[in-house]
């Protein structure tokens, strides 16, 4: 194990990352945010109670969206229909879909079918078939706060090996989340996931990972889902980030991005890929999953 990144609070006049204030000079949250610098990382925002409450509300809307869309994921539906349903649901719940027009992304959700790892673009041409798997990734903005989650659904009835694969992917995420608490290293996420899935001859996508979230769509730290010494960062109360492993149903973790649309990421060997995601808060002695739907 390499040296552990040290936590140092920067003076207010020197709270910079990559040459600029990540919150921007006019951000209404800037005055109340505590920013910390890690050697070997960049800048991680420690959220206060007001911000955590706001992020929790946004996260619940995102989770409720995934719960709402589940009965519509059936054979014969196209992903543009799913996109519109999710868009309308978020808007009706006073939220804005964060992906819409984000760096030019044209839709309100990501819909990734079968060998699409992430960032699939909804389309009327993508019609679900019995046995498909599809990941729906939703990020809701509510009152300026962000909540991010995703889930892989099975369309109809799939091959038992595929059903098992999807279940193992979700278990990998849950095992990693259960290992989180203040004082542990962020790298425990990747170590836990990689160790678990590789025993089934699956692999962890390395090109994409989780991220800090809450005041922005994407914040530091980057969260690796394989063992990575760059993630040897001490977890601290008030950190919020996503745990979102992308697992390939083969030993080949490599992916390729569509040259046509610049977004769609597929497995290089055309194997299936599954993903689950939660937004997670580090509490005083453990963790809290913020992206849980309302009961009922």
Can you name each region flagged by the protein language model?
Residues 37-296:
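Active-site neighborhoods and metal-handling regions in enzymes and metal-associated proteins
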